[in-house]
Regions:
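Pre-Walker A (pre-P-loop) alpha-helix and adjacent loop at the N terminus of AAA/AAA+ ATPase modules
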Residues: 17-70
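Short regulatory helix/loop adjacent to the ATP-binding pocket of P-loop NTPases
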Residues: 194-207
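Walker A/P-loop
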Residues: 67-107, 132-136
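Substrate-gripping "pore-loop 1 plus following alpha2 helix"
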Residues: 122-129, 159-183, 212-214
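Structural recognition of the conserved hydrophobic beta-strand(s) that form the central parallel beta-sheet
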Residues: 147, 172-176, 186-193
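Conserved AAA+ ATPase small/helical "lid" subdomain
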Residues: 1-4, 232-283
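Conserved AAA+ ATPase "SRH/arginine-finger" region at the nucleotide-binding site
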Residues: 207-225
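Short glycine-rich substrate-engagement loop in P-loop NTPases that contacts/grips substrate
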Residues: 105-139
Length: 283
């Protein structure tokens, strides 16, 4: 089956073009990048550099059966795992720009993209995704990053008390597809909040990294890079920073997502000129 014949099996909204990645990350180390504020802190930059170096080496090697099939990023919610995977795709896209090759694509796959009620359809969707990876998602010969987000909802451990018969079948198709992946053209990234729920045979096929809660300095740096908050006065920014330090110490703010919500409430309070009635939500 050609990729074009199977294209209807994968929603176009799940294919993120290099052009869209550029909108998020071009100039990501400056304040004008919409996605850059989530990629701060030396730990995140070190992770990005390592993932990029490994994937780039395998893509340039030309060997379709590289030793590293991809990466598994695990950690608490809101710590930037998905953003890190998208940034990896952008960095690879920058390194493999060529007049002779189409721009790379990022395929975003979650449980909703895979799960289907009819027996065998979910397995067929997994096969279709890897078929696209071999031939190109939107153009022949296109390189790609396959991002399986919250992968524990798709490929559950066979020994789990929550696993169903169809989980075994999906896992089996995924095992085979991973082993057949052309690592000179595609890289897989899995993200998970609960790696203990993922089948061990899947975990063993990937390099595993922990993306943990950022430190206080990183959270402050992230807040300071949000463009909308530049409008705050020096006194307001100092107050926000002091409040953030207190929120981190009492555990109210832990993740990047928490910090973004914290900044949003401060911004709203500036508009209202009083404290917002919005409730704080902890992941």
């Amino acid at each position: 089956m050609r990729a074009s014949d199977a294209h209807h099996h994968l929603s176009s909204s799940n294919i993120i073009s290099f052009e869209k990645l550029e909108l998020l990350f071009k100039g990501a180390d400056t304040e004008d990048a919409r996605g850059g504020s989530e990629m701060v802190g030396q730990r995140y930059l070190d992770l990005l550099a390592e993932l990029t170096a490994i994937a780039e080496y395998q893509w340039r090697s030309g060997s379709p059966r590289g030793l590293v099939k991809g990466f598994m990023l695990s950690g608490p919610p809101g710590t930037g795992k998905t953003t890190l995977a998208k940034r990896l795709a952008y960095e690879l896209g920058c390194r493999f720009q060529s007049d002779n090759d189409p721009p790379i694509a990022l395929a975003f796959i979650d449980g909703g993209e895979i799960s289907r009620s009819r027996y065998g359809e979910s397995e067929e969707r997994i096969r279709d995704i890897f078929l696209h990876a071999r031939s190109g998602f939107t153009a022949q010969g296109q390189r790609s990053v396959l991002l399986f987000d919250d992968v524990e909802s798709i490929f559950m451990a066979r020994g789990s008390q929550h696993a169903k018969e169809w989980h075994f079948s999906q896992d089996s198709v995924f095992f085979h597809s991973i082993d057949e992946l052309d690592t000179s053209r595609s890289t897989i990234v899995l993200t998970s909040n609960r790696p203990d729920l993922i089948d061990e045979a899947i975990r063993d096929r990937f390099l595993s990294y922990v993306v943990d809660y950022p430190d206080l300095e990183t959270l402050i740096q992230m807040i300071e890079q949000i463009p909308a908050l530049v409008q705050l006065s020096g006194a307001q920014r100092a107050t926000m920073k002091n409040d953030l330090v207190a929120a981190v110490k009492d555990g109210t703010v832990r993740s990047m997502r928490d910090a973004q919500r914290f900044a949003m409430r401060h911004f709203v309070s500036k508009i209202l000129k009083k404290d917002s009635l919005a409730q704080h939500v902890v992941d």
